[in-house]
Amino acid sequence: MNTTLITGASSGIGEVFARKLAARGRNVLLVARSEEKLVTLCNELGRSNSIRAQYVALDLSKPEAPAQLFAEATKRGLTVDMLINNAGFGSMDDFSKLDLARELNMIDLNIKSLVELTHRFLQPMIARKQGAIINVASTAAFQPVPYMATYAATKAFVLSFSEALWEENRAYGIKVLALCPGVTDTNFFEAARGHKPPARVSQTPEEVVDTALRGLAQGKSHIISGWTNFLMTQSERLAPRSLITRVAGRMMRSQQKDSK
Protein backbone atom coordinates (compact mmCIF):
# COMPACT_ATOMS: atom_id res chain seq x y z
CA MET A 1 0.00 0.00 0.00
CA ASN A 2 1.59 3.28 -1.13
CA THR A 3 1.88 5.54 1.89
CA THR A 4 3.30 8.90 2.93
CA LEU A 5 5.20 8.76 6.22
CA ILE A 6 5.20 12.05 8.13
CA THR A 7 7.19 12.62 11.31
CA GLY A 8 6.27 15.34 13.78
CA ALA A 9 2.73 14.90 12.47
CA SER A 10 0.61 15.73 15.51
CA SER A 11 0.69 19.52 15.09
CA GLY A 12 2.02 22.43 13.05
CA ILE A 13 3.59 21.84 9.65
CA GLY A 14 3.46 18.06 10.02
CA GLU A 15 -0.26 18.05 10.73
CA VAL A 16 -0.94 20.29 7.74
CA PHE A 17 1.11 17.98 5.50
CA ALA A 18 -1.10 15.12 6.71
CA ARG A 19 -4.32 17.02 6.05
CA LYS A 20 -3.36 18.26 2.60
CA LEU A 21 -1.99 14.92 1.39
CA ALA A 22 -4.97 13.00 2.76
CA ALA A 23 -7.23 15.43 0.89
CA ARG A 24 -5.33 14.43 -2.26
CA GLY A 25 -6.19 10.79 -1.60
CA ARG A 26 -2.86 9.67 -0.15
CA ASN A 27 -2.65 7.11 2.63
CA VAL A 28 -0.61 8.36 5.57
CA LEU A 29 1.48 6.94 8.39
CA LEU A 30 1.79 9.60 11.06
CA VAL A 31 4.54 9.62 13.67
CA ALA A 32 4.84 11.72 16.82
CA ARG A 33 5.13 11.26 20.56
CA SER A 34 1.51 12.05 21.46
CA GLU A 35 -0.63 8.98 20.84
CA GLU A 36 -3.79 10.82 21.85
CA LYS A 37 -3.31 13.50 19.19
CA LEU A 38 -2.38 10.93 16.56
CA VAL A 39 -5.48 8.82 17.22
CA THR A 40 -7.74 11.85 16.91
CA LEU A 41 -6.08 13.05 13.71
CA CYS A 42 -6.04 9.62 12.06
CA ASN A 43 -9.72 9.07 12.81
CA GLU A 44 -10.60 12.46 11.35
CA LEU A 45 -8.51 11.98 8.21
CA GLY A 46 -9.85 8.50 7.58
CA ARG A 47 -13.47 9.61 7.87
CA SER A 48 -13.11 12.80 5.85
CA ASN A 49 -11.02 11.54 2.95
CA SER A 50 -11.69 7.81 2.50
CA ILE A 51 -8.01 7.03 2.91
CA ARG A 52 -6.14 4.80 5.32
CA ALA A 53 -4.57 6.84 8.11
CA GLN A 54 -2.30 4.98 10.51
CA TYR A 55 0.03 6.10 13.27
CA VAL A 56 3.04 5.09 15.32
CA ALA A 57 3.57 6.86 18.65
CA LEU A 58 7.34 7.13 18.99
CA ASP A 59 10.05 9.45 20.27
CA LEU A 60 12.39 9.65 17.29
CA SER A 61 15.21 11.16 19.33
CA LYS A 62 15.76 7.75 20.94
CA PRO A 63 18.63 5.84 19.27
CA GLU A 64 16.55 2.76 18.52
CA ALA A 65 13.46 4.61 17.26
CA PRO A 66 14.22 4.99 13.51
CA ALA A 67 14.93 1.27 13.15
CA GLN A 68 11.75 0.48 15.08
CA LEU A 69 9.72 2.72 12.78
CA PHE A 70 11.14 1.14 9.63
CA ALA A 71 10.46 -2.34 11.00
CA GLU A 72 6.88 -1.38 11.90
CA ALA A 73 6.16 0.06 8.46
CA THR A 74 7.57 -3.10 6.88
CA LYS A 75 5.54 -5.32 9.21
CA ARG A 76 2.35 -3.53 8.18
CA GLY A 77 3.13 -4.09 4.51
CA LEU A 78 3.37 -0.39 3.72
CA THR A 79 5.21 0.93 0.69
CA VAL A 80 6.53 4.29 1.84
CA ASP A 81 6.87 6.16 -1.42
CA MET A 82 6.99 9.58 0.24
CA LEU A 83 8.92 10.40 3.41
CA ILE A 84 8.51 13.75 5.14
CA ASN A 85 11.11 14.29 7.86
CA ASN A 86 9.48 17.10 9.82
CA ALA A 87 10.18 16.16 13.45
CA GLY A 88 12.52 18.56 15.18
CA PHE A 89 12.81 21.29 17.78
CA GLY A 90 14.95 24.26 18.73
CA SER A 91 16.16 26.16 21.77
CA MET A 92 16.81 29.83 22.34
CA ASP A 93 19.35 31.43 24.69
CA ASP A 94 23.07 31.92 25.10
CA PHE A 95 24.55 28.54 24.22
CA SER A 96 26.49 28.46 27.51
CA LYS A 97 23.23 28.79 29.45
CA LEU A 98 21.32 26.05 27.65
CA ASP A 99 20.94 22.53 29.01
CA LEU A 100 23.59 20.39 27.31
CA ALA A 101 21.51 17.21 27.40
CA ARG A 102 18.71 18.98 25.54
CA GLU A 103 21.11 20.35 22.93
CA LEU A 104 22.47 16.86 22.28
CA ASN A 105 18.91 15.52 22.14
CA MET A 106 18.19 18.15 19.50
CA ILE A 107 21.10 16.90 17.40
CA ASP A 108 19.82 13.33 17.78
CA LEU A 109 16.36 14.30 16.50
CA ASN A 110 17.14 17.01 13.96
CA ILE A 111 20.10 15.19 12.37
CA LYS A 112 20.73 11.58 13.41
CA SER A 113 17.12 10.43 13.23
CA LEU A 114 16.56 12.23 9.93
CA VAL A 115 19.67 10.66 8.39
CA GLU A 116 18.76 7.15 9.52
CA LEU A 117 15.15 7.37 8.35
CA THR A 118 16.28 8.76 5.01
CA HIS A 119 18.82 5.97 4.57
CA ARG A 120 16.40 3.18 5.51
CA PHE A 121 13.48 4.34 3.37
CA LEU A 122 15.61 5.55 0.45
CA GLN A 123 16.95 2.09 -0.37
CA PRO A 124 13.52 0.59 -1.22
CA MET A 125 12.73 3.73 -3.23
CA ILE A 126 15.89 3.19 -5.28
CA ALA A 127 14.90 -0.43 -5.88
CA ARG A 128 11.47 0.73 -7.13
CA LYS A 129 12.99 3.70 -9.01
CA GLN A 130 10.30 5.94 -7.57
CA GLY A 131 9.84 8.00 -4.43
CA ALA A 132 10.05 11.41 -2.79
CA ILE A 133 11.66 12.77 0.36
CA ILE A 134 11.00 16.15 1.96
CA ASN A 135 13.39 17.17 4.73
CA VAL A 136 12.28 20.19 6.71
CA ALA A 137 15.21 22.58 7.13
CA SER A 138 14.81 26.31 7.82
CA THR A 139 15.90 29.72 6.61
CA ALA A 140 18.23 29.46 9.64
CA ALA A 141 20.22 27.01 7.50
CA PHE A 142 21.67 29.86 5.43
CA GLN A 143 23.60 31.69 8.16
CA PRO A 144 24.75 31.37 11.78
CA VAL A 145 22.03 32.35 14.26
CA PRO A 146 23.33 33.55 17.62
CA TYR A 147 21.16 32.42 20.54
CA MET A 148 19.91 29.53 18.39
CA ALA A 149 23.37 28.24 17.54
CA THR A 150 22.76 24.49 17.70
CA TYR A 151 19.38 24.65 15.98
CA ALA A 152 20.69 26.70 13.05
CA ALA A 153 23.67 24.35 12.67
CA THR A 154 21.38 21.31 12.53
CA LYS A 155 19.32 22.93 9.80
CA ALA A 156 22.43 23.85 7.82
CA PHE A 157 23.25 20.14 7.88
CA VAL A 158 19.75 19.22 6.68
CA LEU A 159 19.96 21.64 3.76
CA SER A 160 23.40 20.46 2.61
CA PHE A 161 22.52 16.79 3.10
CA SER A 162 19.27 17.09 1.17
CA GLU A 163 20.77 18.96 -1.77
CA ALA A 164 23.49 16.33 -2.10
CA LEU A 165 20.90 13.53 -2.10
CA TRP A 166 18.84 15.41 -4.69
CA GLU A 167 21.75 15.11 -7.12
CA GLU A 168 22.67 11.54 -6.15
CA ASN A 169 19.17 10.20 -6.70
CA ARG A 170 17.88 12.05 -9.75
CA ALA A 171 18.91 9.16 -11.99
CA TYR A 172 16.68 6.82 -9.96
CA GLY A 173 13.59 8.97 -10.42
CA ILE A 174 13.57 10.00 -6.76
CA LYS A 175 12.87 13.58 -5.71
CA VAL A 176 14.59 15.04 -2.65
CA LEU A 177 13.61 18.48 -1.37
CA ALA A 178 14.85 20.61 1.50
CA LEU A 179 11.99 22.79 2.70
CA CYS A 180 13.23 26.06 4.23
CA PRO A 181 10.48 27.91 6.08
CA GLY A 182 11.05 31.08 8.03
CA VAL A 183 9.13 32.04 11.14
CA THR A 184 5.89 30.04 11.03
CA ASP A 185 2.77 30.28 13.17
CA THR A 186 3.28 27.06 15.14
CA ASN A 187 4.26 26.25 18.72
CA PHE A 188 7.96 26.17 17.77
CA PHE A 189 8.94 29.34 19.62
CA GLU A 190 6.92 28.46 22.69
CA ALA A 191 8.66 25.09 22.82
CA ALA A 192 12.04 26.74 22.29
CA ARG A 193 11.75 28.98 25.31
CA GLY A 194 8.28 30.35 25.84
CA HIS A 195 8.59 32.97 23.09
CA LYS A 196 5.93 33.95 20.58
CA PRO A 197 6.84 34.31 16.89
CA PRO A 198 6.84 37.86 15.49
CA ALA A 199 3.53 38.10 13.63
CA ARG A 200 4.86 40.60 11.09
CA VAL A 201 7.04 37.95 9.46
CA SER A 202 5.08 34.78 10.25
CA GLN A 203 3.63 32.47 7.63
CA THR A 204 0.90 29.95 8.27
CA PRO A 205 1.72 26.23 8.17
CA GLU A 206 -0.68 25.99 5.22
CA GLU A 207 1.40 28.46 3.23
CA VAL A 208 4.58 26.56 4.04
CA VAL A 209 3.15 23.19 3.03
CA ASP A 210 1.73 24.57 -0.22
CA THR A 211 5.21 25.90 -1.02
CA ALA A 212 6.76 22.51 -0.27
CA LEU A 213 4.38 20.55 -2.46
CA ARG A 214 4.86 23.01 -5.31
CA GLY A 215 8.64 22.77 -5.00
CA LEU A 216 8.49 18.98 -4.94
CA ALA A 217 6.34 18.90 -8.09
CA GLN A 218 8.86 21.18 -9.80
CA GLY A 219 11.76 18.90 -8.89
CA LYS A 220 13.64 21.52 -6.89
CA SER A 221 16.50 20.64 -4.55
CA HIS A 222 15.38 23.21 -1.99
CA ILE A 223 12.69 25.81 -1.67
CA ILE A 224 12.36 28.84 0.59
CA SER A 225 8.85 29.58 1.78
CA GLY A 226 7.83 33.22 1.48
CA TRP A 227 9.09 36.04 -0.73
CA THR A 228 10.51 38.03 2.20
CA ASN A 229 12.38 34.97 3.43
CA PHE A 230 13.74 34.37 -0.07
CA LEU A 231 15.09 37.92 -0.31
CA MET A 232 16.67 37.66 3.13
CA THR A 233 18.50 34.44 2.29
CA GLN A 234 19.81 35.89 -0.96
CA SER A 235 21.17 39.00 0.75
CA GLU A 236 22.85 36.78 3.32
CA ARG A 237 24.80 35.09 0.55
CA LEU A 238 26.17 38.43 -0.69
CA ALA A 239 27.16 40.12 2.58
CA PRO A 240 30.19 39.18 4.73
CA ARG A 241 29.33 36.36 7.12
CA SER A 242 30.60 38.32 10.11
CA LEU A 243 28.17 41.13 9.30
CA ILE A 244 25.28 38.73 8.78
CA THR A 245 26.03 37.04 12.10
CA ARG A 246 26.06 40.36 13.96
CA VAL A 247 22.78 41.43 12.37
CA ALA A 248 21.23 38.07 13.23
CA GLY A 249 22.43 38.46 16.80
CA ARG A 250 20.77 41.88 17.11
CA MET A 251 17.52 40.53 15.69
CA MET A 252 17.50 37.59 18.08
CA ARG A 253 18.21 39.81 21.09
CA SER A 254 15.32 42.04 20.04
CA GLN A 255 13.08 39.00 19.57
CA GLN A 256 13.95 37.70 23.03
CA LYS A 257 13.20 41.09 24.58
CA ASP A 258 9.90 41.64 22.73
CA SER A 259 8.50 38.19 23.48
CA LYS A 260 9.20 38.12 27.21
Q: Where do the language-model regions lie?
A:
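Conserved glycine-rich cofactor-binding loop
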Residues: 10-11
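Conserved glycine-rich Rossmann-like NAD(P)H-binding loop of the short-chain dehydrogenase/reductase
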Residues: 24-41
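The beta1-alpha1 cofactor-binding region of Rossmann-like NAD(H)/NADP(H)-dependent oxidoreductases
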Residues: 35-36, 56-68, 100
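Substrate-binding pocket helix/loop in short-chain dehydrogenase/reductase
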Residues: 94-96, 102-107
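Active-site helix of classical SDR
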Residues: 118, 154
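Residue(s) in the substrate-gating loop at a strand-loop-helix junction
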Residues: 138
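SDR active-site lid
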Residues: 166-231, 242
